């Protein structure tokens, strides 16, 4: 498999999510700022990752994204399939 911009951004964003999730759900804007990614682009990637069941989200003032399953059990292949192959729109 070849890394695409989508897969590279998604992988880096999930690493950032893992590092920040200790304090609770993480806002996509915070990850976008840390990774210098357009927020709208990252929101599209996170939507695909959520549909694939890799992450989940909660609404509200303290809302944000968090892992839906153990991050140690998520493979690079899972991420690439979620953002590059499945759920294209």
What is each of the regions a protein language model found here?
Residues 51-54, 82:
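Residue cluster at the C-terminal edge of the helix-turn-helix DNA-binding motif
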Residues 54-61, 66-67:
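Beta-hairpin "wing" of winged helix-turn-helix
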Residues 64-81:
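Charged, amphipathic alpha-helical coiled-coil/dimerization segments
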Residues 40:
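Key DNA-contact positions within bacterial/archaeal DNA-binding proteins
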Residues 87-88:
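Conserved small/polar residues in nucleotide/adenosyl-binding loops
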Residues 5, 9-11, 15-37:
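N-terminal helix-turn-helix DNA-binding core of bacterial DNA-binding proteins
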């Amino acid at each position: 498999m070849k890394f695409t911009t989508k897969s590279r951004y998604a992988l880096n964003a999930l690493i950032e999510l893992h590092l920040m999730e200790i304090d609770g759900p993480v806002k996509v804007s915070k990850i976008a700022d840390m990774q210098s990614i357009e927020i709208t682009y990252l929101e599209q990637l996170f939507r695909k990752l959520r549909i694939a069941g890799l992450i989940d989200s909660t609404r509200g003032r303290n809302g944000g994204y968090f892992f839906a399953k153990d991050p140690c059990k998520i493979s690079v292949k899972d991420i690439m399939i979620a953002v590059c192959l499945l759920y294209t729109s």
